[in-house]
From Swiss-Prot:
PANTHER family: UPF0102 PROTEIN YRAN. InterPro entries: Restrct_endonuc-II-like (IPR011335), tRNA_endonuc-like_dom_sf (IPR011856), UPF0102_YraN-like (IPR003509). Disulfide bonds: none annotated. Gene3D superfamilies: 3.40.1350.10. CDD domains: PoNe_Nuclease (cd20736). Belongs to the UPF0102 family. This is UPF0102 protein Mvan_2202. It comes from Mycolicibacterium vanbaalenii (strain DSM 7251 / JCM 13017 / BCRC 16820 / KCTC 9966 / NRRL B-24157 / PYR-1) (Mycobacterium vanbaalenii). One of its GO terms (molecular function) is nucleic acid binding. Signal peptide: none annotated. Pfam families: UPF0102 (PF02021). It comes from the Bacteria. The lineage of its organism: Bacteria, Bacillati, Actinomycetota, Actinomycetes, Mycobacteriales. NCBIfam families: PRK12497.1-3, PRK12497.3-1, PRK12497.3-3, YraN family protein.
Amino acid sequence: MTGTESRAEIGALGEQLAVDYLQGLGLRVLARNWRCRYGELDVIAADGRAVVFIEVKTRTTDRFGGVAQAVTPTKVRRLRRLAGVWLAQQPGHWAAVRIDVVTVRIGRRRVPEVTHIKGVA
């Protein structure tokens, strides 16, 4: 990072790093930045027969809190609603549904720090 990146550029970088991490775990990305009138889902992936809705949070500092503060109860409710809308539009059915959070900490470190919390909702 050069220090001149916009919030959008930092967010896009964090999301790409998260997708790379998830694919490295064997998840298959179905959609990125899926939008409807209620909001946006960052990443939708398949983990075997489970569909996973992933909220990606990118941080350059701890000023806004760490992983524990990344997703509030209000955000979880919104993610559940969005997941329901996406699922209602799908022709098939999934054996399981999961909501995960991936935080990416980038900044002065050479290697970004990725934290993956499975099943937050």
